């Protein structure tokens, strides 16, 4: 949802030297260009239970990454995170994105279990955004040692 949210505030980032979409799209809930609608709605319907376990396991490529995350998990309550998803979904449904060039390039993880990689690639292709694929899960950051590595990923 971060790629979508950052795009909504794009005017605040106009002076940024490099803007990278990482494992997301400007249309985050979309059958062709984001999380398929039915999948997202099922996730939302079962969010309280899902956010207790399986969801976060799906964010990572492997058990080792999940173990690292588990040492410093999200501190917000499940109710708060569910509310955030519900509010974001309402915003997504009520926002018409007429994409203007913003992202310099996109990083898409081959093994993203949250947003189908083929949908991300289709979205970035439609928006003429160069895409680099990497062999990671939805949260690729444990595989980089610095922001410079991410920037040089292109």
How does the language model describe each region?
Residues 13-14, 96-101, 125-126:
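Short, conserved loop/helix-junction motifs that constitute active-site signature segments
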Residues 113-119:
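Conserved alpha/beta-hydrolase "acid-adjacent" motif
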Residues 48-89:
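Conserved alpha/beta-hydrolase catalytic His-Asp/Glu region
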Residues 12-46, 81-92, 144:
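Flexible "cap/lid" loop of the alpha/beta hydrolase fold
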Residues 1-6:
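Gly/Ala-rich beta-loop-alpha elbow adjacent to hydrolase catalytic centers
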Residues 114, 131-151:
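Catalytic histidine-centered segment of alpha/beta-hydrolase-like enzymes
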Residues 18-22, 105-107, 132:
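Hydrophobic/aromatic beta-strand patches that form the interior of the parallel beta-sheet core
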Residues 100, 105-108, 112:
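Short beta-strand/loop motif that positions the catalytic acidic residue
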């Amino acid at each position: 949802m971060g790629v979508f949210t950052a795009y909504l505030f794009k005017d605040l980032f106009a002076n940024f030297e490099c803007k990278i979409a990482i494992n997301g799209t400007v249309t985050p809930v979309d059958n062709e260009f984001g999380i398929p609608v039915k999948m997202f709605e099922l996730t939302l319907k079962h969010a309280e239970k899902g956010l207790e376990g399986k969801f976060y396991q799906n964010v990572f490529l492997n058990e080792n990454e999940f173990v690292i995350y588990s040492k410093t998990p999200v501190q917000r309550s499940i109710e708060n995170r569910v509310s955030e998803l519900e509010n974001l979904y309402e915003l997504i449904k009520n926002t018409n994105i007429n994409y203007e060039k913003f992202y310099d390039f996109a990083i898409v993880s081959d093994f993203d279990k949250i947003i189908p990689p083929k949908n991300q690639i289709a979205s970035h292709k439609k928006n003429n955004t160069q895409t680099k694929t990497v062999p990671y899960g939805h949260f690729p950051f444990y595989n980089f040692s610095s922001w410079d590595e991410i920037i040089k990923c292109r």
